[in-house]
UniProtKB/Swiss-Prot annotation:
Subunit structure as annotated in this protein's UniProt entry: All isoforms including Telokin bind calmodulin. Interacts with SVIL. Interacts with CTTN; this interaction is reduced during thrombin-induced endothelial cell (EC) contraction but is promoted by the barrier-protective agonist sphingosine 1-phosphate (S1P) within lamellipodia. A complex made of ABL1, CTTN and MYLK regulates cortical actin-based cytoskeletal rearrangement critical to sphingosine 1-phosphate (S1P)-mediated endothelial cell (EC) barrier enhancement. Binds to NAA10/ARD1 and PTK2B/PYK2.
Family (UniProt): Belongs to the protein kinase superfamily. CAMK Ser/Thr protein kinase family.
Pro residues composition bias: residue spans: 43-55
Source organism: Bos taurus
Domain (Protein kinase): residue spans on this chain: 725-980
PANTHER family: IMMUNOGLOBULIN, MYOSIN LIGHT CHAIN KINASE, SMOOTH MUSCLE
Region Disordered: start-end pairs: 1-354, 448-497, 673-707
EC number: 2.7.11.18
Record-given protein name: Myosin light chain kinase, smooth muscle
Region of interest (Calmodulin-binding), ranges: 26-41, 972-1035
GO cellular component annotations of the record: cleavage furrow; cytoplasm; lamellipodium; stress fiber
GO molecular function, one term: metal ion binding
Basic and acidic residues bias (residue ranges): 320-335
Disulfide bond entries: 377-428, 1090-1142
Length: 1176
C-alpha cells in the first residue's frame, strides 16, 4: 500500500481488533507515525516539515531519481553484493546468543560502522529474510561518522558487515545501526528516554544508542525481535526459539527481498523524511517496522529517541507473543552496566545532564480587560528542556490570540488583549531527560468598574481559542506550538488603580502665609485629580490654584485667610478605581476685635461695670483673655487698664472730675486683636436717676450681669455635679429632663443645671454633640455651657442662667411697652447671634420664640438657647433634615431638600413677622394646614396690624420669607438692612398693640399644654414625606420628644424647651436595604450601604470579623436622618478582606446584616500555586 498518506494523519493506538491486525499483517506500514507517538517532535502544522538537519539528510529525492546508491568502495552494483550472500550472510535465527551478536541498535559513531551489504565477497552478509541470493538489500543510509550514526549499508568494504538478523559469531556481525566496532551495540528493543539513546540515523555520538528490541541489557543481546537471550535468538518477528527463525520481514521465502527505496509504493514503505538522498539508508528486506528497527530520523538530539521496534498495534499486525511484546516495550530498560553487551556510554551516568530549574519564576499579575497580558520566566537546563504552558490545567497552544515564545532560556506567554476568560492559574512545565520543574502564577483580569462593582462569581470562560483536534504528543509539544519571538526589553507594567503615595498631614498656618498641599499619585494613567472642600470641587480663583500632572496634584493658597479653613479632599480616579485622602487646614491668627461697642453700666461715684461682646472669630484658637484699655479727658492717651477672662469688668478708683472712654482687645495664643470700638464718653458723679434709659438694656436693677468665662467643656465622668454645685429649686421640666437652679460652691455664682435623661449610649452621644457645638459658640448673644457631668442615666449641663423668660412672654408683660424701636433692638441681637453661629459653620435649625430668652426682666438684651438640633455644615455637604416646628420651619426642610444657612433666615423672618404684628404668617387650624401654608409660602401684609408698621420693616420681612433659599438675606445683609440700621434713640416710638400678641401667646400655650403641636412626621398624612421624626442630633438620631407634660408656670419655666414632636409608634429595628458583598482592587475605596428602620432610632455598630470598628480616617461611618447608614473604607488593603456586619439596636430589639469584602491584592506573590496533576 502507499503509506505516504499516513504522514498527514495521527496514528491512533489500539484501534484495530486482533482479526484486523491479522488481515493487515503482511502489509508494510509507515513507521514514522509510530516514531511521532513516542517523542518525535511535532511541527505546528502537521503538513509542514521542519528544515533538515545536516546530520540527517533527506534521501527522498534519491528514491525518485537514483535507483541505486553507490557505496563507499565505489561499487553500486547490488548484484555483486548478493553474489556473495552464500559465503557471509547467515539466517537471522541461527546467530549464537553468546554475546558476539550485535543487535540492530543505535550506538555511538566514533568508529565507522560496517555496512550491511557492502563488504568483501567472503563476508557478504546474507539477507535477513528468505531472499534470493541474486538480490542484495539496500543499505540503510550513510551519515557522517563524526556527528551522527552511519546507515547500515554505507561503511568501508574492508570491515565485516553485520546482518540484520542473528548471524553466527564467526563473522562478528555488525548491528543494523551505526555502532562502533569495539562497543557492544544495544538490542533492537525500546528503552526509557531517560537514557537518551539516539535514533539510527541522527543521534549525537555522546549519547547512548538504543537497541532495536526491548531486551534487558544484562542478558545476552537479543536479536531484532523480542527474544530471550538464553534461548535460541529469535528472528525479528517475535518467533519462538524452537521454531525456524523467521526473516526480518514477513515476506514469503520464495519472494525476493526488495529495497525500501526501489519498490513500488504499494509494496514498499516510503523512505524516511528529512534525510539527504546521498546518505539515505535502505531497509534490508520487507521487515515490519514494528518488529524490526525503526528509523529515528525526525527526532531532536535532546529528545528521547524512539526504538526501532515500537510500532503501534493499530497499524502493524503482530505475530505470536503480542501481549508479551507489549509488556516488554513498556517495562524493559537499557542494558545494565557492567554487562558485556553494554556500551561505554551506558556506564557514564553523568551523560544524562541537569534537570531544569527556574532562575526567574512566574509572578502573580493583575491586568485590565483589553490590556496586554505578558508572563515571563527563565529556565536553565542541560540538555534544553521542553516547555509546556497550561491555563487552569488545559494546555495552551499558539493561536492568533496567544503567542508562546522561547528565546534561549527566556520563556513567555503573550496575549495582546486580555479578556476575563484569560484569568486563572498559569503553569509553565520544563522537562528534559534529567527531570522536570514547574512554576505557576495567578492572573486576574479586571473589568473597568471592578472597584465599585458588587461581588459576583467570575463568569465562565468562553472558548475563545480554537481547540486542537490533534492528540497531545508527550515530551515534544513545545516544538510544535511555541513560536520563537524576541522578548521585549522592558515588560509592560500591569494596570493598577490609582494610589496616593504621598500626602500631607493636617496643617495649621498663620493667616497671610501661603499653603501648598501636594498629593503624589501612582497608578495607570490617565489619572484624574480633583480637590474638593465641603464636597464641592475647588476651582482656580484669585487666591487658590490647582495644578495637576502625572506625578500628582498640588493645591496652592497664596494668602491663607479665615475662609480657607476646613477639610480638603483629594480625589484621584482612573478606569480601575478611585482613592481619596483628606487634610484639615486651620488658618490661625489673632482674634477679631470684640464685636460691638463696650458699654458702661452701674456707674457710681468712683466705679462702673464695663461689658462687651466677644470676638466674632477667635482666630482658630480660643480667646484666652481680654485686655481693657482706658482713655481719660486729661491725659488723652490710651492705656492698658487690666486683663480679664470674662466679657465684663468692674472698674474701680475712677476720678469724678474726668470723662472716660473704654475699648477692649481679645487675646489668644497667636496674638492680640485690634481694639474694639470705643465706648461712649462716660462721666462720673452724675445722678443715678439721670442715667439714660439706654442703660436698661445692659443693666439689671437687682444684680449685675453675670460674668461668664468662655470655656471649652469636656464631660466629667469621674465626679458628680453635687461635688461642685448646690442643687436648689427646680426651674422647669419636660420629657428631656428637668432644669434646676445651681449655686457654685466655690464662687457662689448662680447657674442653671439641665439634667438630661440619657439611658442609651446614643442619647448620651447626642448630648455630647450638643456640648461640642456649644464649645464653638462663645458669643454674648448665645447661652454658654460652663461645665458638664455624666452620671449613670443622666448627663448634666451647667449653663449660663438667663432669668428674663421667653421674649414673647416678656413682650406681653403689662409693664412692657412694645414699639417698632424695641422690635429693631431684638431683631438686631438675634441677627448678631445667628451671624456668629453661621461663621462657625453651624446652623441652629430650631429658631423660635421659646428659644429666645431675655437676660433680665427689665432690659431688652436677649440670648439664644438650645443647640440640640444644631448641625455642622462644614463637612456635611448636602445636608437634609427632617425635624423642626411646623410654624417656623423652612419649606426646604418639609420638602426634604438640602438645607443651608438660609434655613435659619426663614425662621428669623417668621419671628419678625410675629413680633411686629402679633400674627403668625403660616399657622393653620391644624399641622397639615400649617405645613401646606409653609410649603406654598403663602403670606401677606393685608391685616390691619401692618398699617402701623414701616415699609422698611415689611421689606425686611419680605426679603427673608422667600421660598427660594438663595434669594433670602443672610445675617450680614440683615444687619446692613436700612430697618436694622435706624437710629433707635431718635426714631419715633409709636406703641404697637399687644392684644394680637397676647392671643397668639395664649394659643401657643394651649398648643403646648393641650398636646396640639406635632412634628413634621404628620407630613406622612399629606403623602409628602413618610417616616419623619422629631428632634434629631447631629448624628441623625432623634432625642426624646416633649409630651403633653405641662411645664412649671414660673418666670423662667420656659427656659429650655425641646422641639415639640409627636410620638411615633415604637418599632423594632429592621433593614429595608441590606449591605451586599463587594469585590474591590487593593488601594481603592469600598462602601457598604444599608437603610435602617425602627423607633426609637436604633444605635448602629459596625463589625469586622466580629471585632467592632472604631471610626477613623480609614473607616468612616455615615448615618443620616433618614436611616441611611454607610461604612466607607478608604485605601483598601489586603487586611481589609473580611466579613463586615452592621448591627442596629434599640429598646425593642436588634437586627444585623452581613456582607463580605474581597480584596484583589496587587502585591506580586512569589509562591507557586499547587502542583497540577500529572498529564497523561
Amino acid at each position: 500500500m502507499d503509506f505516504r498518506a499516513n504522514l498527514q494523519r495521527q496514528v491512533k493506538p489500539k484501534t484495530l481488533s486482533e482479526e484486523e491486525r491479522k488481515v493487515h499483517g503482511p502489509q508494510q506500514v509507515d513507521f514514522r507515525s509510530v516514531l511521532a507517538k513516542k517523542g518525535t517532535p511535532k511541527t505546528p502544522v502537521p503538513e509542514k516539515v521542519p528544515p533538515p538537519k545536516p546530520a540527517t539528510p533527506d534521501f527522498r529525492s534519491v528514491l525518485g531519481s537514483k535507483k541505486k546508491l553507490p557505496t563507499e568502495n565505489g561499487s553500486n552494483n547490488t548484484e555483486a553484493l548478493n553474489a556473495k550472500a552464500a559465503e557471509g550472510l547467515k539466517p537471522v535465527g541461527n546467530a549464537q546468543p553468546s554475546g558476539f551478536l550485535k543487535p540492530v541498535g543505535n550506538a555511538k559513531l566514533a568508529d565507522t560502522p560496517k555496512p550491511l551489504s557492502s563488504t568483501k565477497p567472503a563476508e557478504t552478509p546474507k539477507p535477513l529474510g528468505n531472499v534470493k541470493p541474486a538480490e542484495t538489500p539496500k543499505p540503510l543510509g550513510s551519515t557522517k561518522p563524526a556527528e551522527t550514526p552511519k546507515p547500515l549499508g554505507s561503511t568501508k568494504p574492508a570491515e565485516t558487515p553485520k546482518p540484520l538478523g542473528n548471524v553466527k559469531p564467526a563473522e562478528t556481525p555488525k548491528p543494523l545501526g551505526n555502532i562502533k566496532p569495539t562497543e557492544t551495540p544495544k538490542p533492537l528493543g525500546s528503552t526509557k528516554p531517560a537514557e537518551t539513546p539516539k535514533p539510527l540515523g541522527s543521534t549525537k555520538p555522546a549519547e547512548t544508542p538504543k537497541p532495536l528490541g526491548n531486551v534487558k541489557p544484562a542478558e545476552t543481546p537479543k536479536p531484532l525481535g523480542n527474544v530471550k537471550p538464553a534461548e535460541t535468538p529469535k528472528p525479528l518477528g517475535n518467533v519462538k526459539p524452537a521454531e525456524t527463525p523467521k526473516p526480518v520481514s514477513n515476506a514469503k521465502p520464495a519472494e525476493t527481498l526488495k529495497p525500501v527505496g526501489n519498490a513500488k509504493p504499494a509494496e514498499t514503505p516510503k523512505p524516511l523524511s528529512n534525510v539527504k538522498p546521498a546518505e539515505t539508508p535502505k531497509l534490508v528486506g520487507n521487515a515490519k517496522p514494528a518488529e524490526t528497527s525503526k528509523p529515528l530520523d525526525n527526532a531532536k538530539p535532546a529528545e528521547a529517541p524512539k526504538p526501532l521496534g515500537n510500532a503501534k498495534p493499530a497499524e502493524i499486525p503482530k505475530p505470536t507473543g503480542k501481549e508479551e511484546l507489549k509488556k516488554e516495550i513498556k517495562n524493559d530498560v537499557n542494558c545494565k552496566k557492567g554487562h558485556a553487551g553494554a556500551t561505554d556510554s551506558e556506564k557514564r551516568p553523568e551523560s544524562r545532564g541537569t534537570a531544569p530549574t527556574f532562575e526567574e519564576k512566574l509572578q502573580d499579575l493583575h491586568v485590565a480587560e483589553g490590556q496586554k497580558l505578558l508572563l515571563q520566566c527563565r529556565v536553565s537546563s542541560d540538555p534544553p528542556a521542553t516547555i509546556t504552558w497550561t491555563l487552569n490545567g488545559k494546555t495552551l497552544k499558539t493561536t492568533k490570540f496567544i503567542v508562546l515564545s522561547q528565546e534561549g532560556s527566556l520563556c513567555s506567554v503573550s496575549i495582546e488583549k486580555a479578556l476575563p476568560e484569560d484569568r486563572g492559574l498559569y503553569k509553565c512545565v520544563a522537562k528534559n531527560s534529567a527531570g522536570q520543574a514547574e512554576s505557576s502564577c495567578q492572573v486576574t483580569v479586571d473589568v473597568p468598574d471592578a472597584p465599585t462593582s458588587e461581588n459576583a462569581k467570575a463568569p465562565e470562560m468562553k472558548a475563545r481559542r480554537p481547540k486542537s483536534s490533534l492528540p497531545p504528543v508527550l515530551g515534544t509539544e513545545s516544538d510544535a506550538t511555541v513560536k520563537k519571538k524576541p522578548a521585549p526589553k522592558t515588560p509592560p507594567k500591569a494596570a493598577m488603580p490609582p494610589q496616593i503615595i504621598q500626602f500631607p498631614e493636617d496643617q495649621k498656618v498663620r493667616a497671610g502665609e501661603s499653603v501648598e498641599l501636594f498629593g503624589k499619585v501612582a497608578g495607570t494613567q490617565p489619572i484624574t485629580c480633583t480637590w474638593m472642600k465641603f464636597r464641592k470641587q475647588i476651582q482656580d480663583s484669585e487666591h487658590i490654584k490647582v495644578e495637576n500632572s502625572e506625578q500628582g496634584s498640588k493645591l496652592t493658597i497664596r494668602a491663607a485667610r479665615q475662609e480657607h479653613c476646613g477639610c480638603y479632599t483629594l480625589l484621584v480616579e482612573n478606569k480601575l478605581g478611585s482613592r481619596q485622602a483628606q487634610v484639615n487646614l486651620t488658618v490661625v491668627d489673632k482674634p477679631d476685635p470684640p464685636a460691638g461697642t463696650p458699654c458702661a453700666s452701674d456707674i457710681r461715684s468712683s466705679s462702673l461695670t464695663l461689658s462687651w461682646y466677644g470676638s466674632s472669630y477667635d482666630g482658630g484658637s480660643a480667646v484666652q483673655s481680654y485686655s481693657v484699655e482706658i482713655w481719660d479727658s486729661v491725659d488723652k492717651t490710651w492705656k492698658e487698664l487690666a486683663t480679664c477672662r470674662s466679657t465684663s469688668f468692674n472698674v474701680q478708683d475712677l476720678l469724678p472730675d474726668r470723662e472716660y472712654k473704654f475699648r477692649v482687645r481679645a487675646i489668644n495664643v497667636y496674638g492680640t486683636s485690634e481694639p474694639s470700638q470705643e465706648s461712649e464718653l462716660t462721666a462720673l458723679g452724675e445722678k443715678p436717676e439721670e442715667e439714660p434709659k439706654d442703660e436698661v438694656e445692659v443693666s439689671d436693677d437687682d444684680e449685675k450681669e453675670p460674668e461668664v468665662d468662655y470655656r471649652t467643656v469636656t464631660v466629667n465622668t469621674e465626679q458628680k455635679v453635687s461635688d461642685f454645685y448646690d442643687i436648689e429649686e427646680r426651674l422647669g421640666s419636660g420629657k428631656f429632663g428637668q432644669v434646676f437652679r445651681l449655686v457654685e460652691k466655690k464662687t457662689g455664682k448662680i447657674w442653671a443645671g439641665k439634667f438630661f435623661k440619657a439611658y442609651s449610649a446614643k442619647e448620651k452621644e447626642n448630648i455630647r454633640q450638643e456640648i461640642s457645638i456649644m464649645n464653638c459658640l462663645h458669643h454674648p448673644k448665645l447661652v454658654q455651657c460652663v461645665d458638664a457631668f455624666e452620671e449613670k442615666a443622666n448627663i448634666v449641663m451647667v449653663l449660663e442662667i438667663v432669668s428674663g423668660g421667653e421674649l414673647f412672654e416678656r413682650i406681653i408683660d403689662e409693664d412692657f411697652e412694645l414699639t417698632e424701636r424695641e422690635c429693631i433692638k431684638y431683631m438686631k441681637q438675634i441677627s448678631e447671634g445667628v451671624e456668629y453661629i453661621h461663621k462657625q459653620g453651624i446652623v441652629h435649625l430650631d429658631l423660635k420664640p421659646e428659644n429666645i430668652m431675655c437676660v433680665n426682666k427689665t432690659g431688652t438684651r436677649i440670648k439664644l438657647i438650645d443647640f440640640g438640633l444644631a448641625r455642622r455644615l462644614e463637612n456635611a455637604g448636602s445636608l437634609k433634615v427632617l425635624f423642626g416646628t411646623p410654624e417656623f420651619v423652612a419649606p426646604e426642610v418639609i420638602n426634604y431638600e438640602p438645607i443651608g444657612y438660609a434655613t435659619d433666615m426663614w425662621s428669623i423672618g417668621v419671628i419678625c413677622y410675629i413680633l411686629v404684628s402679633g400674627l403668625s404668617p403660616f399657622m393653620g387650624d391644624n399641622d397639615n394646614e400649617t405645613l401646606a401654608n409653609v410649603t406654598s409660602a403663602t403670606w401677606d401684609f393685608d391685616d390691619e396690624a401692618f398699617d402701623e408698621i414701616s415699609d422698611d420693616a415689611k421689606d425686611f420681612i419680605s426679603n427673608l420669607l422667600k421660598k427660594d433659599m438663595k434669594n433670602r438675606l443672610n445675617c450680614t445683609q440683615c444687619l446692613q438692612h436700612p430697618w436694622l440700621m435706624k437710629d433707635t434713640k431718635n426714631m419715633e416710638a409709636k406703641k404697637l398693640s399687644k392684644d394680637r400678641m397676647k392671643k397668639y401667646m395664649a394659643r401657643r400655650k394651649w398648643q403646648k399644654t393641650g398636646n396640639a403641636v406635632r412634628a413634621i412626621g404628620r407630613l406622612s398624612s399629606m403623602a409628602m414625606i413618610s417616616g419623619l421624626s422629631g428632634r434629631k442630633s447631629s448624628t441623625g438620631s432623634p432625642t426624646s420628644p416633649l409630651n403633653a407634660e405641662k411645664l412649671e408656670s414660673e418666670d423662667v419655666s420656659q427656659a429650655f424647651l425641646e422641639a415639640v414632636a409627636e410620638e411615633k409608634p415604637h418599632v423594632k429595628p429592621y433593614f429595608s436595604k441590606t449591605i451586599r458583598d463587594l469585590e474591590v482592587v487593593e488601594g481603592s475605596a469600598a462602601r457598604f450601604d444599608c437603610k435602617i428602620e425602627g423607633y426609637p432610632d436604633p444605635e448602629v455598630v459596625w463589625f469586622k470579623d466580629d471585632q467592632s470598628i472604631r471610626e477613623s480616617r480609614h473607616f468612616q461611618i455615615d448615618y443620616d436622618e433618614d436611616g441611611n447608614c454607610s461604612l466607607i473604607i478608604s485605601d483598601v488593603c489586603g487586611d481589609d478582606d473580611a466579613k463586615y456586619t452592621c448591627k442596629a439596636v434599640n429598646s425593642l430589639g436588634e437586627a444585623t446584616c452581613t456582607a463580605e469584602l474581597i480584596v484583589e491584592t496587587m502585591e506580586e506573590g512569589e509562591g507557586e500555586g499547587g502542583e497540577e496533576e500529572e498529564e497523561e
